[in-house]
């Protein structure tokens, strides 16, 4: 039966250790400045992240003006807008401590309706919009993960070390070609188990089979220049997503992707106009799950062991039977 390697109190202390170390190194190595972030945005702005395009944001109206607001799913679009508003230049970027509510999340060991992540965004020049630049950025972030594991091992040697020296890059099409009989999720399990750490490139567009590896909103990532960082989780014995990131759409790719998804109505939103008219800067960015990170590096079996959220009674009871104690 599962046995946590730390008490709840020890876990809380270690969570701070994980977050403090990672935040400090992320800012230094990607040259990012921390900024304050909104919990909600106006509906008409189009700044909310609509994820896979089907999740419902929490909406409410403001008493003062009656304006409709949405609690954010993530800050994928807001960050790009902020870089423009704050006058950042190529090579400069920002990050923020993002908290969100995703009401339609299907709850399980790795998914909660409460989301906490380091959301970051950086301005790039046109010639940087390449797979090579994407991979270089992934390697920088992976280097932080490696150093974090080493740092924790010095304090908590019983946590062990599992990450390989290098992260492996593979495209979603290469995965389909390699494992045509498997579902996309099972392909992720297979490749993560084989290598320990992988970055899957190209998520959102249809593969040669006609199926997508996974859904992505049409209006933030360029589907050819994005991907997910996956580790093999030693406790769950499955693939484990730590980050979704990518080079963002330019006017050409946004135009193409909105057409593919049948979302031409979004062209009228301020955010989308800013991209289509080349007003907003070209960027790369992503979200790095804080609770996911703590769950992996502290070797936890459930995300509820590293964050406070709301869980159905039957799920709490099932966890108790497995010796999993949720916050």
Curated annotation (Swiss-Prot):
GO terms for cellular component: cytosol. GO terms for molecular function: aspartate-ammonia ligase activity; ATP binding; catalytic activity, acting on a protein; transferase activity. Pathway: Amino-acid biosynthesis; L-asparagine biosynthesis; L-asparagine from L-aspartate (ammonia route): step 1/1. This is Aspartate--ammonia ligase. Belongs to the class-II aminoacyl-tRNA synthetase family. AsnA subfamily. Its EC number is 6.3.1.1. Pfam families: AsnA. It is an enzyme of class 6 (ligase). The keyword Manganese does not apply. InterPro entries: aa-tRNA-synth_II (IPR006195), aa-tRNA-synth_II/BPL/LPL (IPR045864), AsnA (IPR004618). It comes from Bacillus cereus (strain ATCC 14579 / DSM 31 / CCUG 7414 / JCM 2152 / NBRC 15305 / NCIMB 9373 / NCTC 2599 / NRRL B-3711). SUPFAM superfamilies: Class II aaRS and biotin synthetases. The keyword Ribosomal protein does not apply. GO terms for biological process: asparagine biosynthetic process; L-asparagine biosynthetic process. Its main location: cytoplasm. PANTHER family: ASPARTATE--AMMONIA LIGASE (PTHR30073:SF5). Keywords: Amino-acid biosynthesis, Asparagine biosynthesis, ATP-binding, Cytoplasm, Ligase, Nucleotide-binding. It catalyses: L-aspartate + NH4(+) + ATP = L-asparagine + AMP + diphosphate + H(+). NCBIfam families: asnA (TIGR00669). It is found in: Cytoplasm.
